[in-house]
Amino acid sequence: MAAKDVKFGNDARVKMLRGVNVLADAVKVTLGPKGRNVVLDKSFGAPTITKDGVSVAREIELEDKFENMGAQMVKEVASKANDAAGDGTTTATVLAQAIIAEGLKAVAAGMNPMDLKRGIDKAVVAAVEELKTLSVPCSDSKAIAQVGTISANSDETVGKLIAEAMDKVGKEGVITVEDGTGLEDELDVVEGMQFDRGYLSPYFINKPETGAVELESPFILLADKKISNIREMLPVLEAVAKAGKPLVIIAEDVEGEALATLVVNTMRGIVKVAAVKAPGFGDRRKAMLQDIATLTGGTVISEEIGMELEKATLEDLGQAKRVVINKDTTTIIDGVGEEAAIQGRVTQIRKQIEEATSDYDREKLQERVAKLAGGVAVIKVGAATEVEMKEKKARVDDALHATRAAVEEGVVAGGGVALVRVAAKLAGLTAQNEDQNVGIKVALRAMEAPLRQIVSNAGEEPSVVANNVKAGEGNYGYNAATEEYGNMIDFGILDPTKVTRSALQYAASVAGLMITTECMVTDLPKSDAPDLGAAGGMGG
């Protein structure tokens, strides 16, 4: 086992604070409308330019192991805030730095660290409740656009695009961000249910100009099996041909004789058919087939429940107003499934989302809800260079998370004002003893830090502006972009309550642990083995 280096008390805390400050100082230059960019060197490819706090935090590793421990613990604050609300990482880092710096001063002055932590925790619990009372619901497009604009570093086009996307696909819809091909940002909305599977044979194409299969009012056959024998399908094909409607087959696979016969029938015009593979794999495929069945009012033909393809009738088939299939995707528009059945299915999937343990599973389940309940919108980010594209895409992602958080828990006045008002409201809060009271004061003083940092980044004097804001009340604050005072809501400067709440909770959680640290242990650097030089022997 490697030898360890151990530091105690003040020595440990000073080192830890130095690491915290290096990371926080790098992150906090990005805060606010006049925050600056940070350039990150990559081991391969061009450097990345970012104004996203968590991207900066993730890049920082310090040489001194004790300092690095401090930095890594604050990195955890940024990551947790990012996971919870998707934004507010810089605010969380600034809050953590302020609580740690003030807290360690109190420890050095002889306060009991455990009581300080209890005081900080008490102040944060009260602050979260106060934030909830200040919170205003965010439901109209204008407020959503404002939240998106602020989170995308005052880029109005991004805010408007996100608000438009939410209008089109609803609050539950899936909105994804992709690389665009031009210089302008675009919004693409897919109505209906789309999945990533294309036609199994190009001979199904009936719109050569677009290279797609478009079928009006088709029947939809859903089968949880491979279809290779055409005899199994004859009864269904005959019934569909009599009804004079096209047929879409969605199955595990359609191959061999069955596929060849379907192609021949289509080319001769006997019955219009198109076949695609079912989306997903394994259990997810079964679930997605069931989703399509619910949407189209059909039944999944599955041997697991004793159904055979030969015995399928028109009643077992789903229907939709239109189905469009191209090389890579299939879109089902206006399925005829009952609204009550679709809502029931959505509720069932939401329950699974609550119980999901992995982020990947949760994301896939949310996609399924969106496909059933709303639709899918794609924001295509335009930029002149790849470096700009990456930076802008990260900002759009942040803005998207912020707007979702705003819709979920409402909004409060932005620009650090909400936390200043909360701190003023809690000024009379007391605890069991003097050390805990100091802990409360540490937390309340730290709540001014985001406002001060925004002002500092704008090149103004933080103390003057902070005093002016504290002298006002309600949503009165300082607009760092235009350098004027006024009502933050009227200025359109809003922060999602969830983002502010998460930033405060995670910052206090990690800062409380660091204040109570008394000893730090790390591996001693390994000294390289001495070079033995060349072995003696006969000369050549």
Curated annotation (Swiss-Prot):
Enzyme nomenclature, EC number: 5.6.1.7
GO cellular component: cytoplasm
Binding residues annotated for ATP, in chain numbering: 30-33, 51, 87-91, 415, 479-481, 495
Catalytic activity as recorded in UniProt: ATP + H2O + a folded polypeptide = ADP + phosphate + an unfolded polypeptide
Span of the signal peptide: none
Database matches in SUPFAM superfamilies: GroEL apical domain-like (SSF52029), GroEL equatorial domain-like (SSF48592), GroEL-intermediate domain like (SSF54849)
A Pfam short name: Cpn60_TCP1
Alphabetically ordered keywords of this record: ATP-binding, Chaperone, Cytoplasm, Isomerase, Nucleotide-binding
Annotated compartments: Cytoplasm
Gene Ontology terms: biological process: protein refolding
PROSITE patterns in the cross-refs: CHAPERONINS_CPN60
Gene3D superfamilies in the cross-refs: GroEL, GroEL-like equatorial domain, TCP-1-like chaperonin intermediate domain
GO molecular function, one term: ATP binding
Isomerase as UniProt keyword: yes
Domain of life: Bacteria
Major localisation: cytoplasm
InterPro entries, per the entry: Chaperonin_Cpn60_CS (IPR018370), Cpn60/GroEL (IPR001844), Cpn60/GroEL/TCP-1 (IPR002423), GroEL-like_apical_dom_sf (IPR027409), GROEL-like_equatorial_sf (IPR027413), TCP-1-like_intermed_sf (IPR027410)
Role this protein plays: Together with its co-chaperonin GroES, plays an essential role in assisting protein folding. The GroEL-GroES system forms a nano-cage that allows encapsulation of the non-native substrate proteins and provides a physical environment optimized to promote and accelerate protein folding.
Subunit structure: Forms a cylinder of 14 subunits composed of two heptameric rings stacked back-to-back. Interacts with the co-chaperonin GroES.
HAMAP family on file: CH60
UniProt similarity note: Belongs to the chaperonin (HSP60) family.
Name of this protein: Chaperonin GroEL
Organism for this UniProt entry: Klebsiella oxytoca
Name of the gene encoding the protein in the UniProt record: groEL
